[in-house]
Structures are given as structure tokens and as C-alpha cells.
Amino acid sequence: MQWYLSVLKNYVGFSGRARRKEYWMFTLINAIVGAIINVIQLILGLELPYLSMLYLLATFLPVLALAIRRLHDTDRSGAWALLFFVPFIGWLVLLVFFCTEGTSGSNRYGNDPKFGSN
């Protein structure tokens, strides 16, 4: 839960770097929260996904900021995040980038998050 909350605290922090662990732990918890919200909507019998849409809006900027910081960790520009808008191929490329180990030591986006804070 600490990984999830730390990303939310850095709500619009687009600079710096994010480790794979931070990215994937946030993504996992985000998916679990989304699933719980969907179950609640089913129980309440909501025809339109109001709660899901509200949650997506609330987490859009933190998810985008985290994705950009993750790209920075691999020494890539945040502009690569535009691949989110290219179905399948773009998502596959981003998946590879997000799974790639970050550059060791400092890079143009900051210090290595494995060895201290940015």
C-alpha cells in the first residue's frame, strides 16, 4: 500500500525517475481497487459506471506521471507515453519499456532511484 500512496502523494510529479517496483506495485493495487469498485457497482446495480469513471479521472494524472517517470528511469523521454494512444503495438512497446531495467547510476532525468531519492 505504501507504493500506491507514495505515487498519489507525488500526484503530478512528472520529473525524476520511478523504479520498476514502484510502477508495478502501483499498477497492481490500482487494478485491485478498480476491480473492487466494479464489484460495488454491480452490487448497487448501477447501469452506468459512475464510480469507475470517477476513479479513472482521479487517478489519470498520477498514472500518467508515474508512466513518464518510469520512462525516465530507462533514459527515455516522457513523449514515449503518447504510445498509449496507439492500440496494441504502442501498448506492447510501452510494456517492454516498463519491464526494462532502469539505467544504472544517474541519467539526464536524475539519480538512480535504487540508491536514494531523486
Curated annotation (Swiss-Prot):
Chief location: membrane
Subcellular location: Cell inner membrane
Gene Ontology CC terms: plasma membrane
Pfam families named in the record: DUF805 (PF05656)
Membrane-side (Periplasmic) residue stretches: 1-25, 69-77
Origin superkingdom: Bacteria
Membrane topology reported for the UniProt record: Multi-pass membrane protein
The keyword Membrane is annotated on this UniProt entry: yes
UniProt keyword list: Cell inner membrane, Cell membrane, Membrane, Transmembrane, Transmembrane helix
Record protein name field: Inner membrane protein YhaI
Organism encoding this protein: Escherichia coli (strain K12)
Source species taxonomy: Bacteria, Pseudomonadati, Pseudomonadota, Gammaproteobacteria, Enterobacterales
Gene encoding the protein: yhaI
